[in-house]
């Protein structure tokens, strides 16, 4: 279904040169992404760039209509030093986890750029479906120092018998995406 939609859209997309697909049914003329990755070199040729060069494109959520492209340049990650250092309070040689799927902008600004620049080790923990027990067990096991998640995740975490987990290594927690109700804040702070 998605392939058919893309095929119908291609005539209107004059700048698209190639389409890469993951899967078994790859249309004629399209690229097999996995085969391309397997055939790629392990060496990356660094291409000179300036801070004003285009780096990535986000897409808005489309709350006022169709999603819009938001272009970011190479100076963009530097802005998130402030995010990591002063909001998330990551520290050099600390262990940081932001709960965010890679499809969200928060994945980049809340989990990679400023955090690495500030010297934190980043925890890559992606599961198919959120499970509060598994998450709390991980936080206890790895001795996390900073943690960022949407308030919904904090609400699920406090529904577990959270006192049985040793989360004493966590020095700072932060939220993003929605308001955090006081009950959840105070319960988590008690730990």
Q: Where are each of the predicted segments found?
A:
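Structural core segment of the AMP-binding/adenylate-forming
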Residues: 1-35
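Adenylate-forming
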Residues: 1-9, 25, 125-127, 140, ...
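A short helix->loop->beta-strand "cap" motif at the edges of active sites that frequently abuts
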Residues: 13-19, 120, 168-171
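Conserved pre-ATP/AMP-binding loop-to-beta segment of ANL
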Residues: 21, 27, 37-59, 66, ...
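Conserved S/T- and glycine-rich ATP-binding loop of Class I adenylate-forming
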Residues: 54, 60-63, 96, 139, ...
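Conserved G/P- and acidic residue-centered "switch" motifs that form tight phosphate/ATP-binding loops
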Residues: 63, 119, 177
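Conserved AMP-binding/adenylation subdomain of ANL enzymes
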Residues: 78-95, 99-145, 160
């Amino acid at each position: 279904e998605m392939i058919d939609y893309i095929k119908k859209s291609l005539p209107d997309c004059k700048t698209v040169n190639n389409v890469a697909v993951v899967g078994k049914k790859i249309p004629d003329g399209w690229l097999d992404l996995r085969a391309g990755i397997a055939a790629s070199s392990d060496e990356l040729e660094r291409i000179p760039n300036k801070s004003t060069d285009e780096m990535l494109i986000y897409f808005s959520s489309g709350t006022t209509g169709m999603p819009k492209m938001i272009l970011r340049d190479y100076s963009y990650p530097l802005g998130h030093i402030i995010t990591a250092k002063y909001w998330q309070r990551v520290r050099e040689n600390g262990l940081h986890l932001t709960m965010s799927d890679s499809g969200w902008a928060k994945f980049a600004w809340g989990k990679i750029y400023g955090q690495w620049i500030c010297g934190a080790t980043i925890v890559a923990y992606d599961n198919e479906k959120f499970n509060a027990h598994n998450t709390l067990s991980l936080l206890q096991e790895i001795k996390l120092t900073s943690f960022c998640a949407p308030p919904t995740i904090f609400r699920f975490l406090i529904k577990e018998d959270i006192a049985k987990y040793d989360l004493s290594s966590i020095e700072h927690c932060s939220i993003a995406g929605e308001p955090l109700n006081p009950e959840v804040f105070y319960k988590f702070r008690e730990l």
